[in-house]
Design a protein with these regions (language model features):
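N-terminal accessory segment detector
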Residues: 1-102, 107-127, 137-172
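Ligand-binding pocket scaffold of soluble enzyme catalytic domains
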Residues: 134
Length: 172
């Protein structure tokens, strides 16, 4: 077992970062594999429930480090800053009201990878909605997530071209 207490902090950081990239890579490979080998299951309710379960699980694990979440929209953004999205992507949060914000991914690494592998885009709409729903509801059961746009759509006029997707997050 990795003796994390014997490692220098920078070494441990680098190891964990490489592990994150490895998990992200295999996630993409599994999605492609399932789409090709199990097309009836790919995109099924059970498939998307796994996405939602992952989001909720991530929120629970973060709560072990960050503490039990309090009330309010600020808790959602606090947890978001420590999520896998923040680890892999440039995330922009735009506060709208006391109970809502938009979450934007800038220059999405997954979209870049999809193009590198020959696809026009990665279809993240349904899965992305379910992961975010599980994550934010795992922090606050009153959270609601709505898709504003995801590829192949582009943002409305005035949205910078480097915004890959946008989500509205609120507490009801």
């Amino acid at each position: 077992m990795l003796d994390i207490h014997a490692l220098e902090k920078d070494t441990l950081h680098d190891i964990m970062l490489q592990q994150l990239y490895s998990f992200n890579y295999i996630w993409m490979r599994f999605e492609i594999f399932i789409a090709m080998k199990a097309p009836d299951e790919y995109g099924s309710e059970e498939y998307y429930q796994l996405h939602e379960d992952f989001g909720a699980y991530q929120a629970r694990r973060l709560a072990r480090v960050l503490g039990t979440p309090g009330e309010g929209i600020g808790e959602l953004t606090r947890f978001l800053k420590h999520s896998h999205w923040a680890a892999f992507e440039d995330i922009e949060v735009v506060d709208l009201t006391a109970d809502s914000f938009t979450m934007r991914t800038l220059d999405c690494s997954v979209q870049r990878a999809a193009k590198k592998w020959g696809a026009q885009h990665y279809d993240c709409g349904k899965g992305g909605l379910r992961v975010r729903t599980g994550f934010f509801k795992g922090i606050n059961p009153g959270a609601k997530v709505q898709r504003v746009f995801t590829p192949p759509e582009v943002g409305s006029e005035g949205i910078p071209a480097n915004v890959s997707c946008e989500w509205l997050v609120s507490i009801e």
